[in-house]
């Protein structure tokens, strides 16, 4: 039996991933993956940098860590479904029903009504807990999708852990409605800053260009030398 909320999510239409429509929609939203930065709890990105990105001044095409994570995401999902007896589906970018400037793309939703969020860290140590900077993403996704539970999946394949064992950790997270009530005003204020800077420009938050100073070593002036010479009384 498919959960009623999941059934509605699966029947909805979504823009294809990476399509022009998907990029346009995403550019006009504060997404779940942006939430920690907007709230100031992401140690890897400053709020100012996210504003610049949303205004088109910064572009992120991925790095080694994100490419690695994308490479093993499907594998991690399959392992989870096999171990937990779940059936999972992927859906596209979903706006919040009441706040359409908020959106998110889950890594999966199960037919039993759980959100899946998958992380395949390249170097970070996996612990049996959710890193604080990922919790806003999970909570916002549960709000957007109207789901009450989430499985936070962390996976390191043999390619990374060899000669040690594969690492696969699943943390169960419950929806926290109070978190959303407390965070919504902060997220909205941040989004209003984005809209303001889109209209007025970003000159006031652009990183200052560092001017390198060239230090020229000047030659020291010649020292005055006093020479005392012996002389005869007739010469002095």
Please give the residue ranges for each predicted region.
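Accessory terminal regions of nucleic-acid processing enzymes
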Residues: 1-236
């Amino acid at each position: 039996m498919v959960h009623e909320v999941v059934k509605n999510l699966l029947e909805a239409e979504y823009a294809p991933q990476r399509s022009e429509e998907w990029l346009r929609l995403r550019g006009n939203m504060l997404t779940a993956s942006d939430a920690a930065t907007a709230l100031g709890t992401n140690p890897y990105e400053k709020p100012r940098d996210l504003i610049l990105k949303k205004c088109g001044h910064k572009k992120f095409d991925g790095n080694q860590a994100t490419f690695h994570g994308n490479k093993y995401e499907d594998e991690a999902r399959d392992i989870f479904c096999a171990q937990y007896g779940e059936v999972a589906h992927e859906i596209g970018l979903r706006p919040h029903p009441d706040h359409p400037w908020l959106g998110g793309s889950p890594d999966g939703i199960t037919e039993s009504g759980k959100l899946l969020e998958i992380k395949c860290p390249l170097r970070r140590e996996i612990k049996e807990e959710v890193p604080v900077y990922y919790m806003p993403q999970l909570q916002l996704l549960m709000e957007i999708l109207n789901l009450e539970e989430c499985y936070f999946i962390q996976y390191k394949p043999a390619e990374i852990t060899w000669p040690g064992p594969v690492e696969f950790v699943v943390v169960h997270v419950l929806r926290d409605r109070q978190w959303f009530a407390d965070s919504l005003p902060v997220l909205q204020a941040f989004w209003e800053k984005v809209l303001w800077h889109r209209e007025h420009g970003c000159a006031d938050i652009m990183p200052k260009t560092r001017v390198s100073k060239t230090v020229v070593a000047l030659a020291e002036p010649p020292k005055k030398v006093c020479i005392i010479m012996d002389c005869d009384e007739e010469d002095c």
